[in-house]
Design a protein with these regions (language model features):
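Active-site and adjacent substrate-binding regions of carbohydrate-active enzymes
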Residues: 2-5, 31-717
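Long, intrinsically disordered low-complexity tandem-repeat segments
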Residues: 4-34
Length: 717
């Protein structure tokens, strides 16, 4: 179209492109010209220390509720993991948790207890390597016809042994998918308890109450940062310049005014963003509103007007052939390529290919769209010398501000960065600036983490990398990797690799000049039942014995400088299932209420807590792994002469035959003399007495773990 080209040429010459003006106009009208995510303060904000007493007044606990609360409090004050199941705590009346947390709040107010220092206020994020983590989804707390809400989520906290909560996304969503957010700056009102909302404690304050509950119970809290939003998310319509778009012709057969081989340049993005901006302004003007974003405090009429304007804007975009470009597959090259239009379903079809031209559409999720961190990506192809992608600073800055906004307002202690599993292979240059595809690059990650830690150097960072490249990820600013243990059985190859990783971590973390970092031992993760992984819940596939063995290995292989934080998920404690499914549909877990497993979980945690002061300063002195069993010996680190304590861990490994290892003989250093102590079977006994000299003889059953705690006989207690 020569007319359009002439207009563009004139605009370029004047430095005032029409599309940029349109984008600027809509963002000014929405009050969102700054490249930051505008996280709003709660309406009628309540002092954090007053939230649970106020909730207690609203819910009015009765005598029975207070008795139940006192019983839970007694268990907490005993200092051991609760043997009560998460299912039973969840099904307790709401006033019980209100009474419990209000009591803890009064103890703080009266000086009988103190809140632990908030981890993000630390001088560095090394606390992450000493913490343990649990994934918790508010929506998945639904049960027995009760919707998942922040107050339901707070009920689970006393039965979670981990001291850091990885909070799943809590924003409004599309397609019922938790990881397809509509806006990263709003708390989803669907996660708010309606009784509390009606009483004046809205969604933002209910989130604050949950975070306060974590603080009262000594737990850090983490935010889940996503580099994408739902397709046609509200933020995409109001901030279109942050995203990548296509504009189709009237027949939906091809792109308008864009080279199909290079459709994702800055000029193309800004032009279509200007059209989206104009559509958004028109829709908002028609309904008399200034923003599409649903805000706490909006009355019913305003909310309805915003929704009508929002869906009108989506319809107008579709009618004009304008679509957001979806996320590429994790192993894709460049950005997805428009390949046709499904006229029956009325949506564009994209091709997803890797750098070898192979179809990788099976790995793609078409419901979300990435921030346009770079302009100039090629369709299904990596960068060419004459088409170097250019950073889109506005998108990078906006993404980098999301966590900072939430942390500044609510005090989040760490960020879990989603979609970084391929980070080490995401760029073509050593500086991490030239992207292979539309995902995060080291450049973007570094800027986001720098923004997160500005003024708060203690902010931690967890990478969703299912690997052990701790050195490389630490250089980018991460403190933890997820690891891949949740994808494997406890067998000889895993133990050999885990012990080798332990040695790597010990050597690395002994160097004070390096950023301290480690790898989690994940007993489970929220997505392990997906078809890309196990295909069903691990608890269902493995059963209580194998899950208990995973728990024991995670705890007692974590020694000294090779410590690996436990990573668990809500429901693990009583083998409840359905966490992945709850991220794709509005539903809760299948609350299995397995009291026997919860009791075994509590026993393992109690033993670990008793041994932890020793384990944290100890070292693995000897080890052995064969096809059917493994053992390792833990002694004080850096000590010459006979040790004052020895802990031996022995376990039967997963095998195809499923036979008992039977009699095993573990050699001990003869100069240690006679040792005596207790043998703890997991799961099983609380500890039988034993006395040994020179070697330790054990009988191992299939999939059994045995912990032997020994001291020199003259000092045995």
């Amino acid at each position: 179209m020569p007319e359009r080209k002439a207009v563009r040429k004139a605009d370029q010459k004047a430095g005032q492109k029409a599309d940029q003006k349109a984008v600027r106009k809509v963002e000014q009208k929405a009050g969102q010209t700054a490249d930051r995510c505008p996280v709003p303060r709660p309406v009628d904000s309540i002092d954090a220390g007053s939230l649970w007493p106020e909730i207690e007044k609203i819910l009015a606990p009765g005598q029975g509720d207070r008795a139940a609360s006192d019983a839970i409090l007694a268990d907490i004050e005993a200092g051991t993991a609760l043997a009560r199941t998460q299912s039973s705590l969840l099904r307790a009346p709401d006033p019980v948790v209100a009474a419990l947390l209000s009591t803890l709040e009064r103890q703080v107010a009266e000086g009988r207890a103190s809140l632990p220092d908030q981890r993000h206020s630390a001088t560095d994020p090394s606390w992450m390597t000493r913490a343990d983590f649990c994934y918790l989804s508010v929506r998945a707390c639904a049960h027995d016809g009760v919707s998942g809400s922040f107050i339901q989520a707070a009920k689970l906290l006393p039965a979670i042994a981990a001291d850091a909560i990885h909070l799943a996304p809590f924003h409004p969503i599309h397609f019922d998918v938790v990881y397809a957010p509509e806006s990263p700056s709003v708390v989803d009102p669907a996660l708010a308890d309606p009784v509390l909302s009606a009483a004046g404690i809205g969604p933002e304050n209910q989130l604050r109450a949950f975070i306060r509950a974590c603080r009262l119970l000594g737990k850090a809290i983490g935010y889940d940062l996503m580099p994408h939003v739902a397709q046609f998310a509200r933020v995409a319509l109001e901030r279109p310049s942050l995203f990548r778009w296509i504009h189709l012709d009237d027949k939906r057969a091809g792109l308008v005014d864009a080279d199909p081989s290079r459709p994702y340049g800055r000029e193309e993005r800004e032009e279509v963003a200007g059209m989206v901006a104009g559509i958004c302004v028109s829709a908002k003007d028609n309904y008399g509103i200034s923003s599409l974003k649903r805000m706490e405090g909006d009355d019913e009429a305003t909310t309805a007007a915003k929704d009508r304007a929002y869906y009108t804007a989506i319809r107008m975009c579709i009618e004009n052939g304008i679509w957001q470009v979806p996320c590429h597959a994790w192993n894709g090259a460049g950005a997805p390529a428009f390949s046709g239009y499904d006229h029956a379903a009325d949506y564009p079809v994209f091709a997803y290919r890797n750098d070898r031209g192979e179809d990788v559409s099976a790995e793609a999720y078409g419901v979300s769209s990435p921030y346009a961190f770079y302009d100039g990506l090629l369709p299904n192809s990596i960068t060419e010398p004459d088409s170097i992608p250019i950073p889109n600073d506005a998108a990078i800055d906006y993404f980098s501000s999301i966590f900072s906004g939430w942390s500044a307002l609510h005090g989040f202690d760490f960020v879990r960065m989603d979609a970084v599993d391929r980070l080490l292979w995401s760029s073509l240059d050593t500086e991490g600036t030239l992207p292979v595809s539309d995902g995060l690059t080291p450049l973007v990650v570094r800027r986001a983490l720098q923004a997160a830690r500005k003024g708060h150097p203690g902010i931690g960072a967890l990478a969703t990398r299912y690997g052990t490249e701790v050195e490389e990820f630490a250089r980018e600013g991460f403190d933890l990797l997820m690891g891949s243990d949740m994808m494997r059985r406890i067998d000889a190859p895993l133990l050999r690799e885990a012990l080798a990783l332990h040695d790597r971590l010990v050597e690395r973390n002994a160097d004070p000049s390096l950023h301290r970092a480690t790898v989690c031992f994940a007993v489970d993760a929220h997505e392990t039942s997906s078809t890309r992984q196990w295909g069903a819940a691990m608890a269902t596939i493995m059963g209580p014995v194998r899950m208990g063995l995973r728990h024991a290995v995670a705890r007692f292989l974590s020694v000294g400088g090779g410590r690996r934080p436990l990573y668990e998920v809500m429901g693990f404690q009583d083998l409840s299932t359905g966490l992945y499914e709850s991220s794709l549909a509005t539903r809760g877990l299948q609350w299995n209420d397995n009291a026997a497993f919860a009791s075994a979980y509590a026993a393992t945690e109690a033993l670990y807590r008793r041994l932890r002061p020793f384990l944290d300063t100890a070292a693995i002195a000897g080890r052995y792994v064969c096809g059917t069993y493994a053992w390792w010996i833990i002694v004080p680190a850096g000590r010459s002469g006979p040790p004052h304590r020895v802990v031996v861990v022995a376990l039967s490994l997963e095998t195809g035959e499923g036979l008992d290892p039977g009699h095993i003989d573990i050699p001990l250093t003869s100069s240690w003399g006679e040792l005596e102590g207790r043998v703890h079977h997991i799961p099983g006994s609380t500890g039988a007495e034993v006395s040994v000299t020179g070697s330790l003889v054990l009988q191992l059953k299939f999939l059994e773990c045995v912990i032997v705690d020994l001291e020199p006989s003259q000092s045995f207690y």
